[in-house]
Amino acid sequence: DQGKLRLSDKFPLMIPQRSARFSTPVAPVRPGTMMSAQGLIELSITRSDNPATDALLAAVGGPAAVNRWMRKAGLSGMRLDRDIATLVRDDGEFNPATTVDLRDSATPLAMVQLLAGLHQGRWLSASSRSVLLGAMERCVTGKRRLPAMLPQDARVAHKTGTLSNTSSDVGIINTPDGRAIAIAVYVTGQGGKPNRDYRIAAISRAVYDGYLTESSSLRRTASR
């Protein structure tokens, strides 16, 4: 939207190279296949493709550039410290169920504020917003997470995340009556990934039912 990059511009996938954990401040990568920015966005969001995500991160100027944008956008409680190759290589340094590591973190509130701003068009043009939300609607990872227990007529645009002993799913639930619910669920521990997925799905359904119940109650009150 700033005119610096176009969706048709091509950038190389950033392929991680073998290296020992914590052996370097930044994990080594090599350039791979050239892809358009739009293709990289599609891979990054729909399939949580790490080389595609790192390609986009490099194209916009790295973690520092992303942090500057977040500050300008008024988003606190969210920070990026490493590229994905380094984050994944060094994953497991801390157990997220018992230790809070503030690096590369976002509070659920900050994530919901980002999602709400994206949905409301606070920062992006309609066309750019459509690209991101469209990719989120086509997400193929996390089918057992946010969407799993929702009614079939509820549409979900979401993005998953998975690291050692932690799973997440964040997105926007669109209800049949046209409302949008921004939701961010992070789960640690729980005895394994299937249990974490189930917990995310259950929370998603509870939030969905809660909003629908509240809406029905307000309509009944207004009709009296």
What role is predicted for each listed range?
Residues 20-23, 73, 82, 177-179, ...:
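Conserved catalytic core of the tyrosine transesterase superfamily
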